[in-house]
Design a protein with these regions (language model features):
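Charged, low-complexity terminal tails
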Residues: 1-191, 674, 681-684
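Conserved, carboxylate-rich catalytic/transport cores that coordinate ions
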Residues: 158, 162-791
Length: 791
């Protein structure tokens, strides 16, 4: 240790002592002197030890401790969990968010992105932290895999306060097993809460954390709610809401304010608004839609078109920083589940006064555009108005009119809209926007809330017509704000990172495909690549691969453009009922029109981060619910046979997506056939050593449902037949009929199963019909040697 630090006169050596004496009657060591001493030490020092070295008396100790805490608050020092102090500048400290993995390790993701990337946290570092916590991390070298390791020095903020999970007793101790597998440590429950609520083993409960985990001590929680049995109707949504911490109850202040909102447009609301009541604006939405954000109208004006997009004027009723706004900002988005919606706004606004319902007056913000015959927006203007929707139309209804040429009261306007859509669509293709044709599914429920069937949802031109109208208005909103130099949240979507681009090119090369553009591909290059996918069996999977190479779209207060849509500037203007960024864009546009400036209650940057996070959170919750429902649906299908295609390959097996219902499951590598099967990442396939049989992405297969486990949300299949192989293809077996065909649900004998498993050896197996149409020879069984490995 430095001799100066050992000196008994350390306090007297403080170069700022005279200043401190002028400020305080009983001066303490100055902040500068404390920092200098800590920097000389180079290692964290206990507060008690530092106090002794600085001759802090017993009466001064509490004030000295307060000074250190104030310095920590100001970022000058760090006080870690063990009560030791160190100079912040001496440590290369990084504030991070913990992203835990179900297997016990995790990552510390810097809050401010770094070129070096994330830190890996091994199990020892993860013992005292939980998924989502904000922590201070110090770099701790490079691990064997070349990744940066981190050491958690301090927990700045805990993310988890309530945890949803299953109740169990373990050797007399009440345990909460979190539903979120990233919370991989069991939580001990207080006995009093258990005695009060009396949950049954396996029931879903909510616990409030009373004591957070430490290195050698588990977290402790008390039960605050018993939700019920795991398989109860609607339980999947209750779990997702709590697992993802979705705000689902409006505050009392919000509910009280919402009641004061009128249910009709008043005369005083019309001041300064254009009257569009006679303009035949119509809404076009899905059959089940209840809130209507947007209405459209188009007419031919000379060689050009006039396009009017009227959007619900939510900003008139939800004022900055009022109680409704506070709840809306916290939620940031409506969350859509099958059979349930968690709205951003109270229902009397979202489905009432703000919704553009037919035949009633509603306030709106209008984007009034002139679009040339070439698809360019020649001019536009924004203004507040009052409107009256002339019809509530549906996508299927409009598409039927367009495709069948059926006469209807709105035929002239719909025909004009469709002609304009074709022009805008042509412009979109010329621009190089990436066109993704994804297939969505809809779950049909019975009266008991159980899935009756899953049906594909086909997007028709009526969907695309409205989409193009909304895109046009959103582009105008971004342009308007940029031209008037008003800060707002833009919707930014960047192209691929160098790492993701390299991965994509490698994968495409294995499939004989190419992406142009070199190190900086443009949207047009991506659009050209998408054209190469058309007609391929694996087209849908290639689209997913292409999507994953791009970065996530986010909300930011600076404009970076939208790569996927090929726009230089883009903002969200058209859905203020269900998206908070759209509401802020409305406020910013109104501010410009009124020659004012709109500033939110938190920084634009922080608001962008928050709304982007809430969007991802809602998506994650929706996926959880959908996966749970699909797994539940497949429980009754165990033993049945379905057809599908290989959607993924890994070292433990192949993933298969079933036709029509788009449910994914795993065929374990040990169930692929009587051979040694190896994962070949360089060709994105699994291949048999002896047979040469190969399973490629996009290959057609038939599978039997073997397991559907709600606890882990996994569905397992057993391979029945399929086509792939380097030597020849095996057609789908006559016995491998999809569910609904003859023999549905019948179990095969052991001998039949054995024969089925042999089906991938040298193209032989399941009494299969070869390419010639002749029955294949009886296969020669070869014993399986199962490979070790986790699925």
């Amino acid at each position: 240790m430095n001799k100066n630090i050992k000196s008994l006169n350390l306090r007297e050596k403080d170069p700022f002592l005279s200043r401190e004496k002028q400020r305080y009657e009983h001066p303490l060591p100055s902040r500068e002197w404390i920092i200098e001493l800590l920097e000389r030490k180079g290692v964290p020092s206990k507060i008690e030890s530092l106090a002794r070295e600085l001759s802090i008396t017993e009466d001064e100790y509490v004030f000295f401790e307060r000074r250190l805490k104030a310095m920590a608050r100001d970022g000058q020092v760090l006080i870690n969990r063990r009560g030791a102090v160190c100079a912040a500048d001496k440590l290369d400290l990084v504030k991070c968010r913990v992203e835990a993995h179900k297997d016990g390790f995790g990552f510390a993701v810097p809050l401010m992105p770094m070129d070096e990337g994330d830190f890996v946290l091994y199990e020892r570092q993860m013992r005292g932290v939980m998924h989502g916590d904000t922590v201070t991390v110090r770099p701790a070298g490079i691990d064997r895999r070349g990744r940066r390791e981190g050491t958690v020095l301090d927990i700045v903020e805990r993310a988890q306060s309530k945890v949803v999970g299953r109740f169990y007793m373990d050797r007399g101790v009440a345990i909460l097993e979190p539903e979120d597998k990233r919370l991989n440590q069991s939580i001990v429950l207080e006995p009093d809460g258990v005695a009060r609520f009396k949950p049954e083993s396996g029931q879903v409960i909510v616990g409030k954390i009373e004591v957070y985990p430490e290195q050698n001590r588990p977290a402790v929680a008390k039960i605050i709610e018993v939700l019920g049995d795991y398989a109860d109707s609607g339980m999947e949504i209750e779990i997702a809401v709590r697992k993802h911490h979705l705000p689902h109850r409006f505050s009392e202040a919000c509910a009280k304010s919402a009641k004061k909102i009128p249910d009709h447009v008043r005369k005083s609301d019309l001041k300064g608004r254009a009257d569009l009541s006679d303009l035949p604006l119509v809404t076009i939405d899905g059959e089940t839609a209840r809130d209507f954000d947007d209405a459209v109208f188009a007419e031919k004006v000379g060689r050009n078109y006039r396009l009017v997009v009227a959007i619900a004027d939510v900003s008139h009723y939800v004022r900055p920083d009022d109680a409704i706004d506070a709840d809306a900002q916290e939620r940031s988005t409506s969350v859509y589940f099958p059979r349930r919606v968690i709205p951003m706004l109270p229902e009397n606004l979202s489905n009432g006064i703000c919704s553009l319902n037919p035949d009633v007056e509603r306030l709106c913000m209008v984007c009034d555009m002139v679009v040339t015959y070439a698809g360019n927006i020649k001019e536009y203007r924004f203004y507040p108005a009052v409107m009256r929707s002339h019809a509530r139309l549906t996508y299927n209804q409009v598409w039927k009119w367009l495709s069948d040429g059926i006469g209807n009261p709105h035929k002239a306007q719909i025909d004009t809209l469709y002609k304009l859509f074709k022009i805008l669509q042509k412009k979109r293709l010329a621009r190089g926007a990436v066109e993704f044709e994804s297939v969505e599914t809809q779950m049909i429920f019975d009266d008991n809330g159980k899935i009756e069937k899953i049906v594909p949802v086909v997007r028709n031109d009526a969907h695309k017509l409205i989409e193009e109208c909304m895109l046009a208005a959103n582009v105008c909103a971004a342009d308007f704000l940029l031209k008037n130099k008003h800060t707002a949240l833009f919707r930014n979507h960047l192209g691929p990172t160098p790492e993701k681009l390299a991965t994509l090119r490698e994968q495409l090369g294995l499939l004989g495909l190419q992406l142009g553009g070199g190190d900086n591909p443009s949207p047009k290059d991506y659009a050209a690549l998408a054209e190469q996918f058309k007609g391929r069996l694996d087209a849908e999977l290639l689209q997913v691969m292409m999507l994953r190479s791009m970065q996530q779209a986010v909300y930011e207060p600076h404009c970076e453009g939208h790569f996927g849509l090929a726009y230089e500037a883009y903002a969200h203007f058209t859905s203020p009922i269900r998206r908070y960024p759209d509401l802020t864009v409305h406020r910013a546009i109104k501010a410009v029109l009124n020659r004012k400036t709109y500033t939110p209650n938190k920084s634009w940057q922080a608001l962008g981060v928050h709304t982007s996070f809430c969007e991802r959170r809602a998506d994650d919750a929706g996926r959880d619910v959908e996966n749970w429902l699909k797994t539940y649906y497949m429980r009754d299908k165990v033993g049945e046979i379905f057809e599908g295609k290989i959607s993924g390959v890994a070292n433990f097996g192949i993933f298969v997506t079933l036709d029509d219902i788009h449910i994914d499951g795993l065929v374990h590598i040990s169930d692929l056939g009587e051979d040694y099967f190896n994962f070949r990442p360089e060709i994105m396939a699994i291949e048999g050593e002896r047979s040469g049989i190969r399973f490629n992405m996009g290959d057609r297969v038939a599978v039997r449902v073997a397991r559907a486990d709600l606890d882990d949300g996994k569905i397992d299949f057993v391979l029945i037949a399929g086509e792939s192989g380097r030597r020849r293809k095996v057609k789908l077996s006559a016995s491998a009929k999809p569910a609904g065909a003859a023999g549905k649900g019948k179990s095969k004998t052991t001998a039949e199963k054995k024969t089925a498993r042999c089906g991938k050896v040298r193209g032989r197996g399941v009494p299969a019909v070869a390419e010639s149409g002749k029955k294949a020879k009886k296969p020669v069984p070869i014993k399986v040697k199962k490979r070790k490995g986790k699925s």
